[in-house]
Curated annotation (Swiss-Prot):
Modified residues (Phosphoserine): S20
Residues that bind arginine: S133
Keyword Transmembrane (UniProt): yes
PTM text: Glycosylated.
Gene: Slc38a9
Disulfide bonds, paired cysteine numbers: C254-C423
Descriptive protein name: Neutral amino acid transporter 9
Organism of derivation: Mus musculus (Mouse)
The UniProt record lists the keyword rRNA-binding: no
Pfam families: Aa_trans (PF01490)
Amino acid sequence: MASVDGDSRHLLSEVEHEVSPGPMNIQFDSSDLRSKRPFYIEPTNIVNVNDVIQRVSDHAAAMNKRIHYYSRLTTPADKALIAPDHVVPAPEECYVYSPLGSAYKLKSYTEGYGKNTSLVTIFMIWNTMMGTSILSIPWGIKQAGFTTGMCVIVLMGLLTLYCCYRVVKSRSTISTSDTSTWEYPDVCKHYFGSFGQWSSLLFSLVSLIGAMIVYWVLMSNFLFNTGKFIFNFIHHINDTDTVLSTNNSNPVICPNAGSGGRPDNSSMIFYNNNTEVQLFEKWWDKSRTVPFYLIGLLLPLLNFKSPSFFSKFNILGTVSVLYLIFVVTLKAVRLGFHLEFHWFVPTEFFVPEIRAQFPQLMGVLTLAFFIHNCIITLLKNNKNQENNVRDLCIAYMLVTLTYLYIGILVFASFPSPPLPKDCIEQNFLDNFPSSDILSFIARIFLLFQMMTVYPLLGYLARVQLLGHIFGDIYPSIFHVLILNLVIVGAGVTMACFYPNIGGIIRYSGAACGLAFVFIYPSLIYIISLHQEERLTWPKLVFHVIIIILGLANLIAQFFM
């Protein structure tokens, strides 16, 4: 075996000194070298931020083979046969491989486990939680009642925050193993064995596939309304004449009035004597045709081996949420507030403040506040680890305020009379006609953003399912195609027969939240306290109540 001095030779030829570290330099903890696994990179693919070409020596290639030899001796989680220090390259010689085929230089640091400031960490958590659920918050408030809805949002925010805090602290309860590289499924496996690992995988897939189904329903909705806007604009058709709506310069519609809550796609029934309109209605239907048009566009994107290209558009999610906040604020200013308070008895135009359907809002909020399966990963990159709990609390507070802001403004400004509050749709954008310019822009933003996120969700589902079953995230094009056809088929089926995003969100939220939000964090905490002989009756009762609440939340969704 080569000596330590011999192995300390430079693996890469001398390179031009970097004036600025640049945004692509990835930081890591220099004390954690034993967990690094370098990759052999083709010489033409070794790049720096300033594109200085570097060469890989034969010595580096040989060392790479040694590393792979050690990695085959045992499982990655087992530290017993990890590669010794003299085989692992020095910090300045470590590179991380990008799926795009490039290697980016790692920069050592000593300030923390990551490079993100608290402000960046807070924004990342907020941005990750801001999803499609925000479109259903006003509908959830309508189902619960205005006062009850606000209280439920605050209480669910506090409850999910506490459970998320328990997830963050779960690794520190394990003293027998090095948990620095663990994710939450690893913690579940430690406490519950293979059942914990596979059940966490199952519920994670439920949340992923549920989100993909909601995305397909919404993309069908947005594509339908976009096409309808263009057709109506060309043919000078006013679609507010065919539905119950307000007669002013800021029209609000009740598209499902008299349909028992079922989606109504015949929005131009008064123009059926026009052959052109009849043809358009036949081939441009929200439930019968548009969901199938998306297949030709999105199915090929799901089969990409790497979704790296689509990750470049993540900023669109933030832009979409900020634009929604702007639209809601502007609409509220123009429409004004329309509120009456009746505690238990509904009226013609207003719902009572307390309604028995409040569990529907709880189901929506379980998914709206759901970040428990990836919060450990997000906080690992925080520069100051001692601020993790504080940053998590601030992020949850901002998310709660965002949901309250959107929900209260949409509900309060909904024009009642002449329209009843029960007209608030599961996607509140459906309460604005397709001819509304602000809503049209919002739908375009959201449609494009969802079309870039959808392949990322499909990739995550592929990694979790095929990676666990076959040990390879891309075993063959046949395996990947079958999985994608099943996922797309589920989305098309729901878009055709159950295009109710509020219902889909609350069911999937209550299901995945049962494990990740309510049961696992509480049960792991109870077990750890029992092992340390610190378990008390108040703590036991409190966390058992949380588990029971999660079960009740799921069961209640089937009776609403």
